[in-house]
Amino acid sequence: MDYKNTLNLPKTSFPMKANLVNKEKVFLEEWEKMDLYNYVLEQRKGKPLFVLHDGPPYANGHIHIGTALNKILKDIVVKYKTMRGYRAPYVPGWDTHGLPIEHRVSQELGEKIKEMSPAEIRKKCEEFALRFVDIQREEFKRLGVRGDWENPYITLKPDYEVKILDVFKTLVEEGNVYRSLKPIYWCPRCRTALAEAEIEYHDHKSPSIYVKFRSKEDPNFFIVIWTTTPWTLPANVGIALHPDYEYSVVKVGEEKWVIATDLLDAFSKETGIDCSNVVEKIKGKDLEGKEFVHPIFDDKTSRVILADYVSLETGTGCVHIAPGHGEEDYIYGHVQYGLPIVSPVDEEGRFTEEAGKYKGMFIEDANEVIIEDLKKKGILVHASSITHSYPHCWRCKGPVIFRATEQWFISVDHNNLRQKVLEEIDKVKWIPEWGRNRIRSMVEERPDWCISRQRVWGTPIPAVKCKECGEVTLDPKVIEHFMKIVEKEGTNAWFEKEVEELIPEDFVCPKCGKRSFEKMLDTLDVWIDSGASFEYITTKREDHPFPLDMYLEGSDQHRGWFHSSIFLAVAKRGSAPYKEVLTHGFIKDEQGRKMSKSLGNVVDPMEVVEKYGAEILRLWLASSDYFNDIKISMRIVEQQTEVYRKIRNTFRFLLGNLEGFDPELDRVPYEKLLTIDRWALGRLQEIIKRATEYYDSYEFSKVYNLVVKYCTTELSSLYLDVVKDRLYVEAKDSIYRRSAQTVMHEILIALMKILAPIMTFTMEEVYSHLHEKDRKYKTVQAEYWPEYKEEFIDRELMEDFEKLLSIREDVLKALEEKRQQDVIGHSLDAEVVLVPKNDTIKALLEKYRDILEELFIVSKVSLSDASGELKGELVEVTVKHAEGEKCQRCWKYTTEISTSEDFPGVCPRCLAVLKGERK
């Protein structure tokens, strides 16, 4: 007789195949229709706020795997906090000014750009930026990221530009902004100043030369310097020695050379010059003020100064000083000693007339010519080359130079700003903790902030220059007047209007009292644009109070957005703009290499999405320890499809076996649950507790590992396998089946919620297949986090089960051995004989005697004192084929097979079920 129709086999419309690529688009449409973002916020009305403030990506291209990683991480945090009961708004932003966009636009325009006005170029830049805002918006939405996509903040919008100027005005009012001729990073290809945050370090091959400077007093007395920038020698005005280092005066032929004693051996080894004849030892301070002949221009001199930054790591301990081309040179040479600033290099990196015969040469091309001239003069001691880490432009990737120009700066020490920032850093929670020391050291060491750029695409610095006396003025009254214009017309007005319209009617030159001005055309560093986002978001959005709860970006932002934001916020508001800062690493390829088009190892997130679905990308991210650098390749991503399949199958099994289960009417109270079910419910509480702890510490890879292990080893291979018999065989409404279903229902709901922040599409699909009584909201994203219930953990039961599951492992090994020997096929063919190792284990097995067959999925379990075949830690195990006949309904063996006419060939349990006698 075929009993198949008498079994409670799983039934569900939840498909086995995910078809993610198409299914995700369906959910995106549904979320759009329900206005998901506002709907979820509405469900948390009146709840405490948690605000993750979005660091704006740059709108100059499609999203890449790094920006995808960042947005998904933020989405996981926001969705988790929402489920924990917070009102968690998320307003995306875009950074839209600056050189990279202007660079791309100039490439597109080609020669035409030379005929265009600044206002026309700016219009093209705006169109370009907004085009990519729209492109990136759709790409981020495709990743399943929930946000206020219709109302983002965009740094080029007039209402945002006003806030940039407002923050800037505060700095001007407080006296932190000044103008000065100083050496700053300069990109000769992009023809603009650069800030520290716009610098990248790459290996670069440079000349390495030793040059001797002749004393003006004694033609045979020389100081030997070492430099890797021969092109800066025309700008030389001094030589720096350390005041306290010991220097040796070495006899070389008829000449005496000064070299730091500790560097003599290294110098000799590199140059091949014998330095053993030391005639005198002196301190650096002994030579202070002495004058030496300029290495390039014989009519100029070079003065010895003292500087404690001089090191004994490389070179000679004697440093050539050019205040026009170096930060320390400027501080020690110009500020402390009053040496002149010579900077004979124009904006394109070519020498000016001041450089004499080198005029018109590009600086790097001039290196060889200068070295040859030094050789002819007989003062080149040694020349070679060196590969070292050197600053490069973030945009064009070319090497930069230090060049002295008139620029605007923010003084980081005026009004004790640096110290206040350091104090605020210590009040912030940094995750990982090392972020605190990283940003602290950067703030402690940073120079004043060069904030002016010689480009048109940016927020203009509203400074004016008096035509009568040449005074350049940056006045809060002018900034405020301009802000009112910007509110209505945007910052393009600065480039379109006459200067008289841009300044207050009563404004005159503070130096000469005249009212005849011209506009200055410098623009602000874009790090001020993005750094002022706290001011915009907290004044424009009621649901974004200051300070904001969290900033979450890559670890490079310790010197970027985290850095600029805290300086501007402390200046404007007196405190850090964030309470918590979370950083992630960078994405590398499978071999740990940086992604680059030249290596052909770039993984396009949208390609992954179109091939596998956004869910797989989200799952890959959750599997990664993102605090460190993360590896990715299409192969690595593909591995997640198998993990995804296992998780999906777990949900399908749960849904299939809960078909017809009414969570209100069919639930079994805890005290009536069967033993195995009570254990499983206790384990679920432990899973909920650990998952919550991991989410709270943002350790999503631990959530992933916990859930994957739970689904595969505890559910599929253990609990769900064990209860299949009860689910399929017992009466539909019996306590045996309902007890298992009650716990499976708890598992389904909790697991769905735990995975919802990560697997946002699939858990929405699971939610749509729940019993209507389980769907309180239109979306799983509005649900509350599963509650950890201590009362569901029976400590004694949990401890007992640790031992029982250890015994089960031994039983499974013994079963497998007999399967290999063809003694049994399915485990239900077996009878297991257990020999406990001691009385404690014997008592344990006696205590749980009634559930052992179910737990081991065998037909019979008996205890014995005889020796067993497999020696385990707690028991010895013998497996033999079960006696009797196989029940045609449940496949268990019994010696009491039914001969009933109505239900022949079944065991007593199945007979009772079929007769309706087993409840």
Swiss-Prot record:
ATP binds at K597. Gene3D superfamilies: 1.10.730.20, HUPs, Ile-tRNA synthetase CP2 domain-like. One of its GO terms (cellular component) is cytosol. Pfam families: Anticodon_1, tRNA-synt_1, zf-FPG_IleRS. Binds 1 zinc ion per subunit. SUPFAM superfamilies: Anticodon-binding domain of a subclass of class I aminoacyl-tRNA synthetases, Nucleotidylyl transferase, ValRS/IleRS/LeuRS editing domain. It comes from the Bacteria. Belongs to the class-I aminoacyl-tRNA synthetase family. IleS type 1 subfamily. GO terms for molecular function: aminoacyl-tRNA deacylase activity; ATP binding; isoleucine-tRNA ligase activity; tRNA binding; zinc ion binding. It is found in: Cytoplasm. This is Isoleucine--tRNA ligase. IleRS has two distinct active sites: one for aminoacylation and one for editing. The misactivated valine is translocated from the active site to the editing site, which sterically excludes the correctly activated isoleucine. The single editing site contains two valyl binding pockets, one specific for each substrate (Val-AMP or Val-tRNA(Ile)). It catalyses: tRNA(Ile) + L-isoleucine + ATP = L-isoleucyl-tRNA(Ile) + AMP + diphosphate. Monomer. Its cofactor is Zn(2+). Zn(2+) binds at C887, C890, C907, C910. CDD domains: Anticodon_Ia_Ile_BEm, IleRS_core. The keyword Metal-binding applies. Catalyzes the attachment of isoleucine to tRNA(Ile). As IleRS can inadvertently accommodate and process structurally similar amino acids such as valine, to avoid such errors it has two additional distinct tRNA(Ile)-dependent editing activities. One activity is designated as 'pretransfer' editing and involves the hydrolysis of activated Val-AMP. The other activity is designated 'posttransfer' editing and involves deacylation of mischarged Val-tRNA(Ile). One of its GO terms (biological process) is isoleucyl-tRNA aminoacylation. Its EC number is 6.1.1.5.
